[in-house]
Design a protein with these regions (language model features):
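Alpha-helical repeat scaffolds
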Residues: 14-23, 46-57, 82-94, 119-132
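Amphipathic alpha-helical repeat scaffolds of TPR domains
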Residues: 18-37, 58-75, 99-113
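Terminal domain-start segments
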Residues: 1-51
Length: 152
């Protein structure tokens, strides 16, 4: 790991989010959960979450919301009711960026067949239809659509 990344890793652990944000902005950092893990391998989920929320407060993008959703779904547990937070980020993203299909695909992946899904089957069906328009080979969206339509 280069000295710059070691320094950033230390800064994020010290909660110097503004400084980290500025460095990443000048480097045209691409926000994703995977890229955060690579950039800050020693950070924990709470540090990622706090940094992402700071970053969203500076510039709200759908990619940052998707990174938060992936963190909440696949990172170490932060809270008891993560589905509520994930749903909030999905709704927020789609209210600002309605054509952002990756978050719809994420919702289908996480909440299809989830017994405690905060998203209705009807809305997941709409998301799946949208995903298929962009990615006709998405097998999970096809499965959701077939299952939903067979119940009609």
């Amino acid at each position: 790991m280069g000295e710059k990344m070691k320094s950033l890793d230390k800064m994020i652990k010290e909660r110097l989010y503004a400084e980290v944000y500025e460095v990443l902005a000048t480097d045209n950092f691409v926000y994703s959960y995977e890229n955060l893990q690579k950039a800050f391998p020693k950070a924990d989920s709470m540090q990622y979450y706090c940094f992402l929320m700071y970053s969203i407060s500076k510039e709200e993008t759908p990619e940052k919301h998707l990174a938060v959703c992936n963190l909440l779904a696949f990172g170490e547990p932060l809270l008891d009711d993560i589905y509520t937070l994930i749903n909030w980020h999905i709704n927020r993203t789609l209210s600002l960026f309605p054509a952002f299909t990756p978050i719809k695909s994420f919702a289908v992946y996480i909440f299809f067949h989830c017994p405690v899904s905060p998203i209705s089957e009807g809305l997941l069906y709409e998301y799946a239809l949208s995903v298929l328009q962009e990615n006709p080979d998405d097998s999970l969206s096809k499965e959701l659509i077939d299952e939903f339509e067979s119940k009609k």
